[in-house]
Amino acid sequence: MFLQRLTRTSPLAAGLLLMLAFAGCSGSGPVRESAETQQRSAAGEPVDGELAVPVIPAEALTMYEQATAVMAAGDFVDAELRFKEFVLLYPDYPGAFVNLAIINANNENDPETRAALDAALALDPDHPAALNQMGMLLRRNGNFLEAEAAYLKAVTVSPDYALAHYNLGVLYELYLQRLEAALQHFEAYQALVGDDKQVEKWISDLTRRVAANQRTANVAE
């Protein structure tokens, strides 16, 4: 049952990786791991980057849009080449490094994933997509408290960044066994994205388990 939980995918969670080019900010019960696998499956959709300079050269925008289109189509080999060329010519856009991190994570290349995320966060320490991807990397490598810190920073700088709330729910329930915190962040995710039937089931499950724990604690007192 636990293995089943680690493989189910939430389409709404995966869909939160928005392809906005330069503008804006930028996988026992139900499986919470699906958001953590977004970069390996449905996932791979490119993220947007925050502007590092006020003017976007037209040629840079064209290159970025072409790279994100190739990545969204699932051709990670071509997308990686395009983003590598992009960051050589235009090294000041953190979103491009985040997309490289997603590609490297898809290829299970953790060192390159970390290098790309470090580059993105050096440009913008508060970049929510970079922080979220860093949390995923840290979680995969068993660094749960560091992952928590990365996710929490993402939702602090961008409270409406639903995917980081989702990943906090995953982390708190499956790895840190903090059910009330997991419930809080799944509810925040659901409030932001709307009708996700799978997450609705998870919330019901967690609500029941939290209530049972509270009853047990009351009896013990």
What positions do the PLM features span?
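Helix-start (N-cap) detector for alpha-helical repeat units in TPR-like alpha-solenoids
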Residues: 60, 94-95, 128-129, 162-163, ...
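Structural marker of alpha-solenoid helical repeat scaffolds
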Residues: 89, 123, 157, 191-192
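Alpha-helical segment of the N-proximal tetratricopeptide repeat
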Residues: 53-93
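Position-specific recognition of the canonical hydrophobic site in helix A of tetratricopeptide repeat
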Residues: 71, 98, 105, 136-139, ...
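Terminal, low-structured helical/coil segments at or just beyond the last alpha-helical repeat
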Residues: 29-34, 44-51, 174-221
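Structural signature of tandem alpha-helical TPR/SEL1-like repeats
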Residues: 73-81, 106-119, 140-153, 176-188, ...
